[in-house]
């Protein structure tokens, strides 16, 4: 993890609600909701192609690695993941698409600039951070996309998701990275970590490697 990300806390539900209420357009609200419910990286969120990456029947959204996105947004790892959003959020997503359809239909990115000289252009990462800075000035609450990602991890942990499932949903290559996302260090996490490493050390025959070198 980057140094600035190591000590980042998870956003709280009441903070997210306050930020959502302070938003002046539904695009920003949908972006925040999807990041909170999917746990995707902001580059992955901005890379969503509404013509290919959204399963409108099953309310699922796919992360697909592409290195040629116009807004330079891309998935971190070259792997596909899927996530499901709540029915209410998906309905709101459809509302957003309908609200800005005149602009959206001219290209394929889900999140675009909705005013100004760059209207209709894919939304960029720096524009998202500018939006969150405006929300901080307006509400006094500091929220970043990474904090929303950690919110996802912590709420799934509290809902008793297996550690490996959370790690997979976040797109982490290493379980240790997921553990650092969780704002807890309790017996439940300790037990889950021990069980994971016990099973995987047996899978790779680590004990045999050590035994052969003694």
Q: What does each model-found stretch correspond to?
A:
Residues 86-141:
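Active-site/catalytic core of tyrosine-dependent DNA strand-transfer enzymes
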